[in-house]
From Swiss-Prot:
Organism, as annotated: Homo sapiens (Human)
Its membrane topology: Single-pass membrane protein
Residue ranges the record marks as coiled coil: none
Transmembrane segments: 35-55
Keyword Transmembrane: yes
Name of this chain's protein: Cell cycle control protein 50C
Positions on the Cytoplasmic side per record topology: 1-34
Glycosylation sites: 66
Lineage of producing organism: Eukaryota, Metazoa, Chordata, Craniata, Vertebrata
Classification via PANTHER family: CELL CYCLE CONTROL PROTEIN 50, CELL CYCLE CONTROL PROTEIN 50C
Sequence ranges on the Extracellular membrane side: 56-113
Tissue-specificity statement: Specifically expressed in testis.
The UniProt record lists the keyword Oxidoreductase: no
UniProt KW keywords: Glycoprotein, Membrane, Transmembrane, Transmembrane helix
Length: 113
């Protein structure tokens, strides 16, 4: 019986730091102070981003161009599937009433192709 106990002990892993390594456990400690700080910091960040987005959206200009009648020949050309390889171009010139900032370039006249 003693031989059997020795035989079982010899099959166990070595008791070394390499074989049986204990890693420290990392736990997050949430305190009320930390949670409230993160909550309010996130709220202030979102508020600032919202203000920036609202201010940048105010300077947006929208132009609506109706090209239904002007480019009607292209629509008729595409109704027939055999005309898939034929090219159709439609050009509509338009003008902006005021100056528009595009990066560092100011343009007062644009053309849509």
């Amino acid at each position: 019986m003693e031989e059997r106990a020795q035989h079982c002990l010899s099959r166990l892993l070595d008791n070394s730091a390499l074989k049986q390594q204990e890693l420290p456990i990392h736990r997050l400690y949430f305190t009320a102070r930390r949670v409230l700080f993160v909550f309010f910091a996130t709220g202030i960040f979102c508020l600032c981003m919202g203000i920036i987005l609202i201010l940048s959206a105010r300077s947006t200009q929208e132009i609506e161009i109706n090209y239904t009648r002007i480019c009607a020949n292209c629509a008729k050309l595409r109704e027939n599937a055999s005309n898939f390889d034929k090219e159709c171009t439609c050009s509509i010139p338009f003008y902006l009433s005021g100056k528009m900032m595009v990066g560092e370039i100011q343009e007062t006249r644009l053309t849509l192709h």
